[in-house]
Regions:
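Short, Lys/Arg-enriched charge-dense amphipathic segments
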Residues: 3, 47-58, 98-111
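Short, amphipathic alpha-helical interaction segments positioned at domain boundaries
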Residues: 82-128
Length: 128
C-alpha cells in the first residue's frame, strides 16, 4: 500500500476539516460589468482564519487544499444549496478581499479592463 506524503500545512488543514462542523472557504473572482458571463478567478480555495492573513499564507493554504483534493482526502464544492452567512463574515473583513475590491475599483472605467467587479463564491470543504 502506498503511503501518502502530506506537508505540514496539509496535515494541519486536514485535521481542522475533520474536527470542524463546517469548513467554509471562498473563491475570489473578478467579473465584468460589460460582459455578464465573463469572470476570472483571482484566488482559488481561500481559507482565512484572521482578517490580517497575508497573501503568502493564504496561497500556501490554497495549495494545501488543492493537494488534499488531488489526493482524494477532501471534497471541495462551490455549489452550495444553502450556507450560513456568519461563516463567511471573516472573508468580507479580510485585507485580501479589500485588496480585491480596490483592484476592481481601479479597473472601473479604464479602457481595455473588463474585470471591474469583485465577487466572492462561497464554498465548503468536506472530509472524504
Amino acid at each position: 500500500m502506498k503511503r501518502l506524503s502530506l506537508s505540514p500545512m496539509e496535515k494541519e488543514i486536514l485535521k481542522a476539516v475533520h474536527v470542524a462542523r463546517r469548513f467554509p472557504i471562498v473563491r475570489f473572482e473578478l467579473h465584468s460589468s460589460q460582459e455578464p458571463g465573463l469572470r476570472s478567478i483571482a484566488l482559488n480555495h481561500v481559507y482565512i482564519t484572521h482578517p490580517e492573513d497575508s497573501m503568502e499564507l493564504v496561497k500556501e493554504r490554497s495549495a494545501a487544499l488543492e493537494g488534499l483534493r488531488k489526493k482524494g482526502l477532501v471534497r471541495i464544492s462551490y455549489a452550495l444549496p444553502a450556507y450560513v452567512q456568519s461563516d463567511y463574515q471573516i472573508y468580507y473583513q479580510s485585507k485580501l478581499y479589500e485588496l480585491l475590491c480596490h483592484t476592481a475599483m481601479e479597473a472601473q472605467g479604464k479602457e481595455g479592463f473588463l474585470f471591474d467587479f469583485p465577487a466572492m463564491r462561497f464554498g465548503q470543504v468536506f472530509p472524504k
